[in-house]
Amino acid sequence: MKIGFNFLVLGAIAVLFSLSGCRQHRGVIDDAAVPRLHLEARGGFGSARVVPVEMPASGSSFGVVSEPLVNEFEITNIELVRVELGMALMFQLNEAGARKLYRASVSNRGSRVVLMVSGAPVGARVLDVPIQDGIFFTFTELPDRALEQLVLDMRDTLERIHSRRR
């Protein structure tokens, strides 16, 4: 009887481990390029967690609020565009993201919005005017030749994330 009980317990443990292994990878997207916009932490963020970042090319370092200003669920499209000063990324936001960006651009004038891709800072823009249309432009500190692939990777990640929410 004791051998049967031990066998039953071992069998139950094996089933639990096999089920937990199945859930471990659920929701994980391999090779993800997750874009998020973070606001520079410049006083007044008392209880907010501040994370130090260092820009890849300039070496400029400062703190950003750990909670994203705009997350991957609020970004609807990303384009690589040519503007007067060179190549830039254009982010189109949904209504919730546009509203948050507008509020931040009004109340945090002079602060930077940092583009983080999978947790790594790649670009920043100073909030110099209110952004009312939900379209955010930023330059990066990456070489122009890397931008096209970055945009493709971010779009692919967004498509996979958004398709899982439907």
What residue spans do the PLM features occupy?
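Sec-dependent bacterial lipoprotein signal peptides
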Residues: 1-20
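Structural signature of multi-pass, alpha-helical inner-membrane proteins
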Residues: 2, 22-166
